[in-house]
Design a protein with these regions (language model features):
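N-terminal, immediately post-signal peptide pro-regions of secreted/luminal proteins
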Residues: 28-46
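Intrinsically disordered, low-complexity coil segments
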Residues: 17-19, 37, 116-120
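Generic hydrophobic secondary-structure signal
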Residues: 1, 26, 30-32, 187, ...
Length: 213
């Protein structure tokens, strides 16, 4: 169905060309000039072609996304994903993909916002679990309220997390900005802005249930 189709920046390009395009786009992201260590590091990376992001971001290497039993992961996504996320879309994005994403605004078509408000009222935060393994990947909001988290996510089209909202035990960032789980789940990308690292994440990648329940 159209609503579950993937978004590609330039669908007519070959995979190799697309990879180059995405890498180039992320390397050339504009960052406001400010006298802080974050912007100094990002600016230096852009000038000298280095691929690293400042702490607390934890870097990983390509071996994380090496072929496994099910694409880049050992298992398919869970059957009963949260927020009525589509299984087929989730499995393709999580396990057989490095560049595609759910379409912008997809997360608002699910039951996420309604259920997130309830969870936030009860617990003061929302847990986001790996759609494959059920391991915790993000906890939000932190350092802001739910409305601020939703507003930022709405403005970018995808759930958007900050450094303090990442469970770094289970998440890594690759040199091209790709955000992945330590088990090989494609999550999205790190797209730094003037506030710091911003992790633009597919909802279908973090719609798992704890421990695969």
């Amino acid at each position: 169905m159209a609503r579950h189709s993937f978004f590609l920046l330039a669908s007519t390009l070959s995979s190799a060309s697309t990879s180059t395009l995405f890498t180039t786009a992320f390397s050339a992201l504009p960052v406001p000039v400010r006298s802080n260590n974050f912007n100094k590091l990002i600016t230096r990376n852009m000038i000298f072609g280095k691929k690293e992001f400042p702490a607390p971001c934890v870097m990983g290497d390509e071996s994380i996304m090496s072929p496994k039993a099910h694409g880049t992961s050992e298992t398919p996504v869970q059957k009963n994903l949260r927020w009525n996320c589509d299984y087929d879309t989730a499995d393709r994005i999580c396990n057989f993909n490095r560049h595609y994403a759910e379409y912008a605004g997809y997360w608002t078509t699910t039951t996420f916002v309604e259920e997130a408000r309830k969870e936030y009222e009860e617990k003061g935060e929302i847990m986001f679990y790996d759609s494959n393994t059920g391991k915790p990947l993000f906890v939000a909001p932190k350092g802001r309220d739910l409305n601020s988290f939703l507003k930022e996510s709405q403005s970018h089209g995808w759930p958007s997390f900050r450094d303090e909202e990442v469970v770094w035990e289970n998440v890594r960032c690759l040199s091209n900005g790709e955000a992945v789980s330590v088990d090989g789940t494609h999550l999205g990308h790190n797209l730094p802005d003037g506030k710091g690292n911003r992790y633009c994440i597919n909802l279908v990648s973090v719609a798992g249930r704890p421990d695969g329940a």
